[in-house]
């Protein structure tokens, strides 16, 4: 072999090697807003020489539609909430987890970790990740007196000044106003036909006050920033975003209490990157990452060891000083046996003139 052939061969090998190094595996996520922020995802990408690509969902129904509509294979990791996590596990849409690959799993809150939501047939299908309420948010410069009830949204002087989530959570909220969470809050997720009709009537009465229904956190943040709304049902994510912008926002849980969620991380059954996905789950439930996620979202972490990295003020803001007491004020989402009927009622509310 002559010198020219050797040089050309070495050049070809070098080019091939360079191409391999440039090509990165992509881990695809379908998660709630804020769960793939570069501030904490970038370190995982660098360590594992991969790219994390995220699509955000606006509701649990959107997640279920995508998983059941043939696009499940497009995603490796999902973040279902407590209302659909069990359904996903039962339907075989998630892969069982090898807990030996998740050493931080045992650091998670026992109350969250031992929930039956993501357990089926002796297997664990998801890890608790973040939790929180759907609180009442209001602009302190636009609302003179602090509201203490969800019923404040129906006040006549708030015509065209409120926003609600385009989600079944608004159905639950109206049911609370009507007292259907008494004596058992679980009844919110299994309302009768008569109760759902009463909820529909109550929400149609609310429509003159609704400036816009929001579907993403950024949308509600903008509505407040532009002073289009004065009060809304929201997420702690919006409170966190608006406070960082210096906006005079306040968050509270009304006297009726509120609904809320426990978000989990799951690996889809169709994922072709299950090993990398498991490494991602471990990274996301480590104490240091949990702290970074709370910095972005304002949500409460599933790993209580993350509080060792927080100031006292941060712990108090996230209600990690006494999480059990705070959880008692949150009626965490449950499976809704008649979800199709709930959605039918909600769609009728939206269509009503």
PLM feature segments, named:
Residues 323-353:
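Conserved C-terminal helix/tail region of periplasmic/extracytoplasmic solute-binding proteins
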